[in-house]
């Protein structure tokens, strides 16, 4: 057992070094990933609200739509359910689908993109963590950072604050 301050420091250090705090716990403390994720993902999803605008905007995009998260696929499904986005996505991939290797590591993308049959030059990656866009960019995907903190990194094609607004812009043909 560790105190909260020590736990927070460990979490931040593991996230920085290993991509997720889970990966650091697995590496340094032999934590079972399924046990850990079952505990941290046991949350109240009812605080989330449906987002009809986002659903409509996503549905206007051509092609397959996938979710790839450093959380688990079941966790992502719950989030999507409470956000009213269940029927928008064709496939959902979680960290378990990458053998618990997290984004931003190249192996994680290689595993998931291979399973999903991603055609790199015809795909885009939307991500809220800038460091998770470098590998997809190098693979030839268009990269979109969705965050209040904007980025001018060379591997970020677009940096936007609001995903719904961005999608509305590109699907209305007013996109430059």
PLM region descriptions:
Residues 53-62:
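Catalytic-core regions built around general acid/base machinery
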Residues 45, 49, 67, 100:
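Short, surface-exposed alpha-helical recognition segments that flank or form part
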Residues 8-10, 41-45, 63, 96, ...:
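Short, contiguous strand/loop micro-motifs
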Residues 28-29, 43-44, 54-55, 94, ...:
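Residue-level signal for alpha-helical context at structural boundaries
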Residues 1-53, 74:
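N-terminal helical cap/lid subdomain that shapes the substrate entry/recognition surface
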């Amino acid at each position: 057992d560790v105190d909260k301050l020590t736990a927070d420091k460990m979490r931040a250090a593991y996230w920085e070094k290993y991509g997720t705090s889970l990966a650091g716990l697995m590496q340094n403390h032999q934590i079972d990933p399924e046990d850990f994720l079952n505990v941290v993902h046991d949350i109240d999803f009812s605080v989330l609200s449906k987002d009809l605008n986002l659903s409509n905007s996503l549905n206007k995009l051509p092609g397959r739509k996938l979710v790839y998260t450093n959380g688990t696929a079941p966790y992502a499904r719950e989030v999507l359910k409470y956000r009213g986005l269940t029927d928008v996505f064709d496939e959902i991939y979680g960290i378990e689908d990458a053998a618990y290797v997290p984004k931003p590591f190249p192996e994680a993308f290689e595993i998931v993109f291979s399973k999903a049959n991603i055609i790199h030059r015809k795909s885009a990656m939307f991500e809220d963590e800038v460091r998770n866009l470098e590998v997809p960019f190098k693979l030839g995907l268009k990269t979109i950072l969705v965050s209040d903190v904007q980025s001018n990194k060379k591997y970020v094609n677009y940096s936007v604050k609001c995903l719904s607004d961005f999608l509305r812009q590109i699907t209305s043909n007013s996109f430059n």
